[in-house]
């Protein structure tokens, strides 16, 4: 399946734009952009970047987060638009639509398969990295924030922390992830069991539609507001900003980490984890990481459990002694800290007193690793022999891992159609993961092959008909094996995996708000075929 994708891409390189084509596109685009806006020539050179601009390559590379797509042979956009104000975004939409060019929207660039900045067809990139204003208002109900989509999660956490240590926001634990893709695709972090998904806290949004018009929640209609909470960015419009409700957290929270080798009964721990982690106190989130033996270290699977408890260490130690003795949690394993420090700890800073929260503001431009991710949802606990088979196989693979994220708690109380994100009532989610250091097709074949192996092993134990996937763990493979399906039929293949029954409503919304399918990418929501409208 992967080979087909690569061949598809390779063929597309030869069809990629000549520089003459890209000059024509630039000239036509600039003409349109000037007609639609009041931009001066001086400002224009910072906003619309042709391939010949000295800023083109640094701007493109700044938010490429997967090194597989950072090579010279990867197709490049004809133009990068770096808007400064809303009207630039409106003009970008109007002009790209007028010239019939595909517009890729990029906020933080963390799309695992690079859909926000690479494509086999002629395309433009709309880079929202200047859209990073955040306004926190603690007096609005229990606290709220307007956050522009080019901001990072780290910036949002930092701005909240500047005002209050007991206010927080439930979203991902990687601070460089962009708000635009993360929130529109669902979003979760280490408080998911207590507070649900990130989208469960979105109360308003502003969006530029396919006609270049700006809407807020009131004027966009509830259907579209429903769709952009989990239905993914890039299918419905350019989200400019989200308004989110903050949550309150205790002044002291606890984190702990327990690492076990196979000799220390790691298998028993992981087996029992499946029963405890999705059912225990919603204030407790325990993630398990299973990884193949890293070079020169051990010969068995590494098992790491990392946890956040929204409370004191004594309480969680007592709780675990009762519910999860296999963990063997001791007070010495626990660290009490503030919520913002817990984020630093999840970023792998062991001594959080020595790290300043300002580190959350670091965007780490132009830093990318070679990687591939896939996802799964588990509805029924695996047996010990089944887990054992997985452990045995994982021990033979290099650099491959599975991250198990417990669900339950708040996720169970919300209906699966409350937002576009459908996978709420599951036991846990798996992220299949492989990250490697070397460039080149050989390494890619080897490591992605490893990932496929664990994905295949898990087939009997994960959701079926369809096998579900998390949109924010973008996986281009899941739409490839389509036996020639195109348009709506192809969209239905990946669409049902990402959105389950919510796919039908998403298609209806898409057809209503963007009937010409201007906002599209390789895995966007399709419009209904004309004979079904
Ligand atoms: P990017 O800019 O690449 O956009 C992703 C998609 O959204 C693209 O299709 C893009 O077109 C679209 N889009 C972006 N901005 C838009 C806008 N303003 N309007 C409309 N469409 C827009 N997830 C999670 O839930 N919890 C986690 O803890 C993590 N952790 C994590 C760590 C790392 C290192 C990576 C690389 C990824 C994650 N993720 C994650 C996954 C992450 O949530 C997902 O990749 C998001 O889509 C990333 O959003 P960005 O804006 O950074 O990506």
Curated annotation (Swiss-Prot):
The FAD cofactor is bound via a bicovalent 6-S-cysteinyl, 8alpha-N1-histidyl FAD linkage. Its EC number is 1.1.1.-. It comes from the Eukaryota. It is an enzyme of class 1 (oxidoreductase). InterPro entries: BBE (IPR012951), FAD-bd_PCMH (IPR016166), FAD-bd_PCMH-like_sf (IPR036318), FAD-bd_PCMH_sub1 (IPR016167), FAD-bd_PCMH_sub2 (IPR016169), Oxid_FAD_bind_N (IPR006094). One of its GO terms (cellular component) is plant-type cell wall. Residues 1-20 form the signal peptide. Glycans are attached at residues 35, 70, 133, 296, 412, 417. Residues 73-249 form the FAD-binding PCMH-type domain. Its cofactor is FAD. There is a cross-link at residues 110-174 (6-(S-cysteinyl)-8alpha-(pros-histidyl)-FAD (His-Cys)). The keyword Signal applies. PROSITE patterns: FAD_PCMH (PS51387). Keywords: Cell wall, Disulfide bond, FAD, Flavoprotein, Glycoprotein, Nucleotide-binding, Oxidoreductase, Secreted, Signal. This is Berberine bridge enzyme-like 12. It comes from Arabidopsis thaliana. The lineage of its organism: Eukaryota, Viridiplantae, Streptophyta, Embryophyta, Tracheophyta.
């Amino acid at each position: 399946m992967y080979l087909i994708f690569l061949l598809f891409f390779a063929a597309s390189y030869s069809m990629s734009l000549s520089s003459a084509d890209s000059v024509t596109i630039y000239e036509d685009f600039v003409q349109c952009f000037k007609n639609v806006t009041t931009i001066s020539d001086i400002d224009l050179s910072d906003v619309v970047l042709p391939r010949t601009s000295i800023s083109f390559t640094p701007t493109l590379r700044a938010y490429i987060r997967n090194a597989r797509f950072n090579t010279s042979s990867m197709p490049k956009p004809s133009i990068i638009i770096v808007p400064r104000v809303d009207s630039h975004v409106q003009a970008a939409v109007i002009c790209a639509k007028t010239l019939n060019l595909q517009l890729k929207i990029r906020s933080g660039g963390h799309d695992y398969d690079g859909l926000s900045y690479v494509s086999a067809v002629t395309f433009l990139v709309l880079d929202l990295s200047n859209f990073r204003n955040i306004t926190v208002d603690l007096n609005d109900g229990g606290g709220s924030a307007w956050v522009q989509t080019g901001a990072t999660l780290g910036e949002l956490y930092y701005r909240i922390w500047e005002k209050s240590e007991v206010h927080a926001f439930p979203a991902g634990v990687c601070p460089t992830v962009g708000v635009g893709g993360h929130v529109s695709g669902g979003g979760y972090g280490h408080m998911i069991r207590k507070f649900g998904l990130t989208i469960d806290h979105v109360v308003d949004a502003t969006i530029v539609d396919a006609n270049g018009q700006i809407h807020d929640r009131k004027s966009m209609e509830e259907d579209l507001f429903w769709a952009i909470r989990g239905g993914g960015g890039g299918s419905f419009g350019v989200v400019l900003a989200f308004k989110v409700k903050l949550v309150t957290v205790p002044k002291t929270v606890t984190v702990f980490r327990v690492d076990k080798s196979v000799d220390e009964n790691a298998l028993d721990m992981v087996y029992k984890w499946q029963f405890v982690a999705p059912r225990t106190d919603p204030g407790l989130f325990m993630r398990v990481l299973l990884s193949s033996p890293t070079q020169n270290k051990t010969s068995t699977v590494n098992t790491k459990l990392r946890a956040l408890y929204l409370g004191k260490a004594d309480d969680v130690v007592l709780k675990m002694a009762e519910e999860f003795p296999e963990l063997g949690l001791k007070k010495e394993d626990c660290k009490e800290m503030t919520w913002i420090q817990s984020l630093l700890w999840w970023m792998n800073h062991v001594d959080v007193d020595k790290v300043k929260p300002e580190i959350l503001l670091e965007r780490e431009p132009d830093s990318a690793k070679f990687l591939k991710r896939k996802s799964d949802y588990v509805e029924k606990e695996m047996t010990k022999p089944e887990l054992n088979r997985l452990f045995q196989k994982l021990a033979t693979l290099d650099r491959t891992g599975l991250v198990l994220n417990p669900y339950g708690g708040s996720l169970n109380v919300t209906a699966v159609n409350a937002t576009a994100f459908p996978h709420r009532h599951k036991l846990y989610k798996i992220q299949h993961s492989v990250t490697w250091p070397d460039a080149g097709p050989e390494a890619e074949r080897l490591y992605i092959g490893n990932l496929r192996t664990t994905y295949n092993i898990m087939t009997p134990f994960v959701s079926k008909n369809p096998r579900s996937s998390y949109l924010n763990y973008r996986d281009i493979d899941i739409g490839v094996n389509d036996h020639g399906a195109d348009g709506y039929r192809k969209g239905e293949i990946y669409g049902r995996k990402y959105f389950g029954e919510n796919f039908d409503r998403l298609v209806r919304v898409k057809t209503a708000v963007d009937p010409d399918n201007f906002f599209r990418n390789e895995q966007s929501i399709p419009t209904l075929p004309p004979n079904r409208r």
